[in-house]
Amino acid sequence: MSFGTRISRALRFLEIPVKNRASVNFLRNPDLQPIKSVNQTWGFWSNFAYWGVLSFNVGMWIGGSSALTVGLSYSETIGAFIIADLLTILFALANSCPGYDWKVGFTLAQRFVFGIYGSALGIIIRILMSIVYYGSNAWLGGLCVNMILDSWSHHYLHLPNTLSSKVAMTTKELIGFIIFHILTAFCYFMKPYHMNYILIWSCVGTFFAMLGMVIYLTKSAHGVGDLFTSTHSTVTGSKKAWAWVYTISYWYGSVSPGCTNQSDFSRFGSSNCAIWTGTIVALLIPATLIPVFGIIGASACEKLYGQTFWMPMDIFDNWLTTNYSAGARAATFFCGFCFVMSQISYTISNCGFASGMDLAGLLPKYVDIKRGAIFAACVSWACLPWNFYNSSSTFLTVMSSFGVVMTPIITVMICDNFLIRKRQYSVTNAFVLKGEYYFTKGVNWRAIVAWVCGMAPGLPGIAWEVNNDYFHNTGIINFFYGDSFFSFLISFFVYWGLCLLFPFKITVKHDDKDYYGAFTDEEARKKGMVPYSEISEEEIRAYTLGECFTSGHEYKPESSDDELPELTKTSSENTKVFEIVHQKDNEKESSTSSEKQIA
């Protein structure tokens, strides 16, 4: 057997298991197709819980500690958080439209805007962000697992550390980290749209656990403590104004990856109202309330124990260490269980499934959502997440810098959706190499330029934040502080301007038929599409199972910036690009296709 044959067999073995191999190629697999209408079941509480787990977790509880390093008082920090939450709501809702309008995820939304090949840029960046967040959340989840184990065994509570002092973690922390990864991995055997019940119940349990902690601490301390009321701002004048701007950018930057791939989960929504109300309530109330809980808890702990415990796990560890009673053990177990559930929910929704969807879009022939999520879990170890929490300033840098890279991507997507395409996209064209979204050799260079222009000015600020001795240019530093605002404006107007100066033709506004069963009959007709129920089984099979890949023709669009070759036969089944519509539809479209350019 030749070496080439062995490689070919190995690659074929690695392909994702599907009933019809023709349904998988380098542009598509079943996980990338629009969600069927029967699976669009996320109502208000499901959408609330998706964003709610962002707040009802340990990371949000300790969020106030990181933000306070910029010099604002507690009340000013909370005010900045509220403004940042409003900004996040606007970005999240605006970027949810492709998912709700066309029931597609982040991968196809990237192809719509950045091009078939250019979409890899945003997908790779989002994967890297997900992996970093995965490691961070898994580390906190491991600490929560240890809460449960501590309540079970006094010996485990005092388990000696056998690791080297050079490693920034203990044996207990490593055990909890491993157990949390194992628990989380089981969740990836279910479909993403079935995880909403886990999200809902984890939010409910964690809210009452945190509320109980605050009530107990404030009652024991006979108030919220002096730290909460006596802390004042340490900056004045313009420095104070920029501290406000920075805190807003930091708080937004910590959740911007979730805004970027909002379409991954808005496509599960049962109605636009459910998505909007669930998102607004979750990002406005819990996202403001839980950091306040954390600040009150730290203030009360300082009065009670002489220390400002920011980590909830440290509070329970102190209780068990000083009094290993039945009451302390019960409280630790139930709160630990709720915290573990919240960390699992947040990790699988915002990191695991998200990275799985992204990896499926990057290598659809070999990766599905389950494989991608498990891969991200394994690679997250390389981030050394235990180092994130050595100091709040280090973690603040990691969190806030994400917005520098992600905000321009979000901005370009919003501009393209509302001003350029007018919320009209063709899903079937996203599975065609040289189709509507081929642009220039597969890349929409306008979007790339806008992204670079919005991102580049903020990069020196990240370097300065890591080491303040690099330079002392006030303008660069202040730009970094307000990057979430400035990069949005730059990317938005650069992309809009480039589309006006160098317009591309829009020849296919949307699909003429609902090939994937993503809409009810009424919804399909409102969009000007033939309902799924009125399409022949042969045509549905051709589009959903990929049999149209074997049609042997390559679709030649009029929208490409390049001069494409004539229609040709292709030899390999796995590299064949399926025909957008039947030949008669192509003839009809070519005769009536609009030559309208973007203006």
Curated annotation (Swiss-Prot):
It comes from Saccharomyces cerevisiae (strain ATCC 204508 / S288c). This is Thiamine transporter THI72. Induction: Induced by limited extracellular thiamine levels. The keyword Metal-binding does not apply. Its main location: membrane. Low affinity thiamine transporter responsible for intake of thiamine. It is possible that the primary function is the uptake of closely related compounds and that thiamine transport is a secondary activity of these proteins. One of its GO terms (cellular component) is plasma membrane. The chain crosses the membrane at residues 42-62, 78-98, 112-132, 174-194, 197-217, 280-300, 333-353, 372-392, 395-415, 447-467, 484-504. InterPro entries: NCS1, Pur-cyt_permease, Uracil/uridine/allantoin_perm. GO terms for biological process: 5-amino-1-ribofuranosylimidazole-4-carboxamide transmembrane transport; nucleobase transport; thiamine transport. GO terms for molecular function: 5-amino-1-ribofuranosylimidazole-4-carboxamide transmembrane transporter activity; nucleobase transmembrane transporter activity. Keywords: Membrane, Phosphoprotein, Transmembrane, Transmembrane helix, Transport. Residues 579-590 have a biased composition (Basic and acidic residues). CDD domains: SLC-NCS1sbd_NRT1-like (cd11482). Residues 553-599 are annotated as: Disordered. It is a multi-pass membrane protein. The modification Phosphoserine is found at S560, S572. It is found in: Membrane. Belongs to the purine-cytosine permease (2.A.39) family. Gene3D superfamilies: Hydantoin permease.
